[in-house]
């Protein structure tokens, strides 16, 4: 099997982002986005998804974190799609429910080629530290749009904002890990009855 490694550069008037993903990694992460909470969440994806992630970003943080947060999501989604290639042999679907203390979040995803986000997180506070919790949805939407995945997030329990968000990223990581794994029984075929994704 060829290495499933990809790099993406995104440069706009608002941000300059470089990202590299290795889908068959060991969970190594180097995240320097200038948004500490986002770095922490990217570390969850790497650690629990066993995806090596290298990302650096310079953005207009003097305005707020929105552009950097969204553009990192865009670059992540584009890089994921590139690393997956034609998707031959992948499992395609993934689901996982992750607890973090009182919080419980379930993620179900399909690397279908059809972008759709069903967002069911109810985060009770506007901020976690300096991070605007509205940006969680913006990150996931950017990933979905640019990787063309279907993503459902459901919160079954949780009262602490940090716990809810982190549980969602851990569940996303584990679901993504299941979906990108190569199924040897597929023998390199596409996981679709249509023969196309």
UniProtKB/Swiss-Prot annotation:
Highest taxon of the lineage: Bacteria
Q: Where in the cell is it found?
A: Cytoplasm
Catalytic reaction(s) noted: D-erythro-1-(imidazol-4-yl)glycerol 3-phosphate = 3-(imidazol-4-yl)-2-oxopropyl phosphate + H2O
Q: Which GO terms describe its cellular component?
A: cytoplasm
* Keyword field contains Amino-acid biosynthesis: yes
- EC number from the UniProt entry: 4.2.1.19
What Gene3D superfamilies does UniProt report for this protein, alphabetically? Imidazole glycerol phosphate dehydratase, domain 1
Matches recorded under Pfam families: IGPD
Its pathway is:
Amino-acid biosynthesis; L-histidine biosynthesis; L-histidine from 5-phospho-alpha-D-ribose 1-diphosphate: step 6/9
Q: Is Lyase one of the keywords UniProt gives this record?
A: yes
One function term, GO molecular function aspect: imidazoleglycerol-phosphate dehydratase activity
Keywords recorded for this protein, A-Z: Amino-acid biosynthesis, Cytoplasm, Histidine biosynthesis, Lyase
Q: Which GO terms describe its biological process?
A: L-histidine biosynthetic process
Report the InterPro entries cross-referenced here: IGPD_sf (IPR038494), ImidazoleglycerolP_deHydtase (IPR000807), ImidazoleglycerP_deHydtase_CS (IPR020565), Ribosomal_Su5_D2-typ_SF (IPR020568)
PROSITE patterns, A to Z: IGP_DEHYDRATASE_1 (PS00954), IGP_DEHYDRATASE_2 (PS00955)
Which family is this sequence assigned to? Answer: Belongs to the imidazoleglycerol-phosphate dehydratase family.
- Official protein name in the record: Imidazoleglycerol-phosphate dehydratase
Organism in which the protein naturally occurs: Gloeobacter violaceus (strain ATCC 29082 / PCC 7421)
| Protein's gene | hisB
């Amino acid at each position: 099997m060829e290495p499933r490694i990809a790099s993406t550069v995104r440069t706009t008037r608002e941000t300059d982002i470089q990202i590299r993903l290795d889908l068959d990694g060991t969970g190594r992460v180097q995240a320097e986005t200038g948004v500490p909470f986002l770095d922490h969440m990217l570390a969850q994806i790497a650690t629990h998804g066993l995806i090596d992630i290298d990302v650096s970003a310079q953005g207009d943080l003097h305005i707020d974190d929105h552009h950097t947060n969204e553009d990192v999501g865009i670059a992540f989604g584009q890089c994921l799609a590139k690393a997956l290639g034609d998707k031959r042999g992948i499992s395609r679907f993934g689901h996982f429910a992750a607890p973090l203390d009182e919080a419980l979040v379930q993620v179900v995803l399909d690397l279908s080629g059809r972008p759709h986000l069903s967002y069911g997180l109810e985060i009770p506070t506007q901020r976690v530290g300096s991070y605007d919790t509205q940006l969680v949805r913006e990150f996931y939407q950017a990933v979905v749009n640019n990787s063309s995945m279907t993503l459902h997030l459901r919160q079954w329990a949780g009262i602490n904002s940090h716990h809810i968000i982190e549980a969602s990223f851990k569940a996303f990581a584990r679901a993504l890990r299941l979906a990108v794994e190569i199924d040897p029984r597929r023998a390199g075929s596409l996981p679709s009855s249509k023969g196309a994704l």
